Amino acid sequence: MKPTYRIFNAVVLGSLVLDQATKVLIDRTMDLYQSIPVIDGLFSITYLRNRGAAFSFLADFSYRLPFFILVSVVALGVIAVTFRKLRDDQHLAAAALALIFSGALGNLIDRVRLGEVIDFLDVYWKTYHWPAFNVADSAICVGVALLAVDMIREERRKAP
């Protein structure tokens, strides 16, 4: 198996297991809207359900569930095709795409299973609250950042 495939599979498996395990743990041990302060004034574990996307985008859209499922499936396909085009030495890009893939898949599993996504990571400062998120959302963000770093590295590699 090519190194990029080993990286991709390991990152997808690890990230997806962590995402789903934390969501099951939150769902089984906390009441909806319950909040547990972790770092006072900065971070709490707060059990929420999100019917929309980031920032509850399209939460009230009547066809939101089929729309988000379709978008997720298309995104997974695009990521898979993009991954297959990587060179054997593009380890960072493989890990980045794996994080994005696992994040999209983790939230897709929630949407299919529950009709919404479990969010629980609650970051805030004084009166400012960042919208709650989960491990899958974090994986997507980290993956996108790593992909940007890889693209910059690739451009520098190509430069004379």
Swiss-Prot record:
The active site is at D119, D137. Coiled coil: none annotated. It catalyses: Release of signal peptides from bacterial membrane prolipoproteins. Hydrolyzes -Xaa-Yaa-Zaa-|-(S,diacylglyceryl)Cys-, in which Xaa is hydrophobic (preferably Leu), and Yaa (Ala or Ser) and Zaa (Gly or Ala) have small, neutral side chains. The keyword Aminoacyl-tRNA synthetase does not apply. GO terms for molecular function: aspartic-type endopeptidase activity; endopeptidase activity. It is found in: Cell inner membrane. Disulfide bonds: none annotated. PROSITE patterns: SPASE_II (PS00855). Its EC number is 3.4.23.36. Pathway: Protein modification; lipoprotein biosynthesis (signal peptide cleavage). Keywords: Aspartyl protease, Cell inner membrane, Cell membrane, Hydrolase, Membrane, Protease, Transmembrane, Transmembrane helix. The chain crosses the membrane at residues 63-83, 89-109, 132-152. It comes from the Bacteria. It is an enzyme of class 3 (hydrolase). It is a multi-pass membrane protein. One of its GO terms (cellular component) is plasma membrane. GO terms for biological process: proteolysis. HAMAP family: LspA. This protein specifically catalyzes the removal of signal peptides from prolipoproteins. NCBIfam families: lspA. Belongs to the peptidase A8 family. This is Lipoprotein signal peptidase. It comes from Geobacter sulfurreducens (strain ATCC 51573 / DSM 12127 / PCA).
